[in-house]
Amino acid sequence: MTGKEEQRVDEKRNALLTVGLVCAVLFVLGVADLCNSDRVYSESENRVLASRPVFSWESLLSGKYGDAYEEYMSDQFTGRDKWVGIKTRADILFRKKEINGVYLGSDHYLIGVNDPEKYTQQMEDSRIVSLKKLVNRWDAKVMLVPTADNILTDKLPAFAPCYDETRLLAKVKESVGEENYIDVYSALQEHAEEPIYYRTDHHWTSLGAYYGFLAWADSMGKFPYPYNTAGMKTVSEDFQGTLQSRINVAWTKDKIQYFPETEKKPVTVTYDFADTADSLYAPEYLETKNQYGFFLNDNHAFIEIYTGYNAGKTLFVIKDSYANSMIPLLTAHYETIYVVDLRYFNGKLFQLMEQYEPEQGMDVLVLYDCIHFLEDFKFY
């Protein structure tokens, strides 16, 4: 056998060994997937994982079954969390600036990617039509909080595309009118050099929520309760939020802080018409990955808050999770606060509001971040 023939044999053998090794790995992983029960929830990613889709010929022919099964396999893949972390380290090594929907910003900021092509004018207009119904019926105040990519622009990688939320905010302001629009964008922009967003999570911090509270008070013509920002209490120094979960590697740790003045008077908090607590905070969440759940015991369809302040004053809040860290600041101005999260509430919104509206009326606040307003603001 000549040297060239031996080389070809070696190459063929190596190729077969490689194919065999890959097949063996895939076989082992496949067996592991079959043996392991599906996970319902990812603690590291703080989200519900996709479950096995139900087969039907209709869903198969439409392509929906294939898409759902692909998502299911991606979520339930054995060792998924470790593989995500390995891929992230490789991407960082190759100096990638966007990983799994997260920009690696300067000063150790992780900033969520909001694709400008995803959020269309049609989507904006549809949400604004629903919003206008609330404003017309209830004289609602509207606060749409810009996400970090629109305020911390100096932290973004060069030329990083992001959805321009100022377009949405201008349309909302024009639609609902200046009297009902709360300009929190300007308030946050003015304090952009301060830690108003978490470095590893998509929410604003308690300091950011405080500036939102001041913007709300100004729009209402109220003298704001004098919370002391220098006196904020730190309850955690190892928070790593939703954005860190997406890249699944260790990152800078955030602090969870709150205003202790919100605990001066006793409160009664009822969650989902059943469970009752005597605090606006749930410290048990500080022992979990989802430490932001410390505020208002995470997310619930409906919350009732009774305080010792301002007899007869009632506020009804329609919100996403951004509101969770600001609502405690509002308790100094109302005796009763009702809170509904449309992502979990399946009833008729106006019917619920009419049921809880007192004879003397109530204030209504719509509080979302801009992205979740576009994605989740729907009611019946």
Predicted stretch roles:
Residues 1-380:
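Extracellular glycan-modifying ectodomains
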